[in-house]
Amino acid sequence: MKIYIIDNGGQWTHREWRTVRDLGVDSTIVPNTVDADVLADADGIILSGGPASIESEISKLGNIKEYMHRYNYPVLGICVGAQFIAIDSGGRVSKALHAEYGKKIVNFTSKDGIFYNIPDSINAWENHNDEIKSISDDYIICAYSDTCRVQAFYHKNRDIFGVQFHPEVNNTEHGTTIFKNFIEKCRR
């Protein structure tokens, strides 16, 4: 099994890689500009977080649109990766009314997809100025915080998932469970 971590310049990309590796899966970090052919053997991809603002710097996200549409593997978007999935689906992302930094309580309204075996509420690590305002009807919004309406989502028919928070950071409760559940989707 092989999962590629697509590096969008996030400060915790190596933590995503290490978490997947520590769960026994071959994983490789690649820049978001790598040719899509490199990902032909992927069983899944993780779109890392990063400092780019979707509103003004979407070009800094390289080829991730092609990665999502060329192959039919599971995708997990984290932070700006999730925001890209929302934009790509026809949703809207813009500056957050309240930027989130540090621990926040994230509440789950549905625990399907990769969000099973997680309590109804968790402490999660946040680090974002932009947020998802809307997403296509093809997705289910399944988690929120008191200041961010879309903390997690999943596609109704495909294995595409997104989280605004950072499950790779130790301060996020049950973050490893989210990665384990994603890996299980990649095994199918």
Swiss-Prot record:
Catalytic residues identified in the record: C79, H166, E168
Catalytically driven reaction(s): XMP + L-glutamine + ATP + H2O = GMP + L-glutamate + AMP + diphosphate + 2 H(+)
Pfam family, any one: GATase
Keyword Nucleotide-binding: yes
GO cellular component: cytosol
Keywords on record: ATP-binding, Glutamine amidotransferase, GMP biosynthesis, Ligase, Nucleotide-binding, Purine biosynthesis
Keyword ATP-binding: yes
Enzyme Commission number: 6.3.5.2
Residue ranges constituting the Glutamine amidotransferase type-1 domain according to the UniProt record: 2-188
Pathway per the UniProt entry: Purine metabolism; GMP biosynthesis; GMP from XMP (L-Gln route): step 1/1
GO MF annotation: an example: GMP synthase activity
Subunit structure: Heterodimer composed of a glutamine amidotransferase subunit (A) and a GMP-binding subunit (B).
NCBIfam families according to UniProt: guaA_Nterm (TIGR00888), PRK00758.1 (NF001975)
HAMAP family per UniProt: GMP_synthase_A (MF_01510)
Function (record text): Catalyzes the synthesis of GMP from XMP.
Family matches, as PANTHER family: GMP SYNTHASE [GLUTAMINE-HYDROLYZING], GMP SYNTHASE-RELATED
Protein's name in the database: GMP synthase [glutamine-hydrolyzing] subunit A
Recorded name of the encoding gene: guaAA
